[in-house]
């Protein structure tokens, strides 16, 4: 008899995945997430958004799991405490910005520190 495979955790992007084209979450999706959480399966929101941008969706869901923001650059627990952060050292970031300004002047750069863009 084959052992039943069980899901231990679910990760989901937000924009274009979890949200409808008009920025809503369907009742069916909310129900599915609640069912997962009732089974003890964390539903982790992941996004390129800032932490506050992820928290907006987290509040819509009543979600109590950690969040992954800035494309994985920052992971926070349910209370907003940092679990993981990967920053580019300031000196290196300034070198990259100078190179982009020189070679690709039309490219826009976004930076973040902590929870701010």
PLM regions: where:
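Asp-based phosphoryl-transfer active-site loop
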Residues: 6-23, 96
């Amino acid at each position: 008899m084959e052992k039943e495979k069980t899901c231990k955790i679910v990760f989901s992007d937000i924009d274009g995945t979890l949200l409808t084209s008009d920025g809503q979450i369907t009742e069916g999706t909310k129900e599915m997430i609640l069912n997962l959480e009732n089974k003890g399966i964390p539903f982790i929101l992941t996004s390129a958004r800032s932490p506050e941008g992820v928290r907006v969706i987290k509040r819509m869901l009543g979600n109590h799991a950690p969040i992954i923001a800035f494309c994985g650059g920052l992971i926070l627990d349910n209370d907003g405490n940092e679990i993981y952060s990967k920053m580019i050292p300031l000196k290196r970031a300034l070198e990259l910005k100078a190179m982009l300004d020189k070679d690709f002047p039309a490219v826009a750069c976004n930076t973040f520190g902590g929870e701010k863009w």
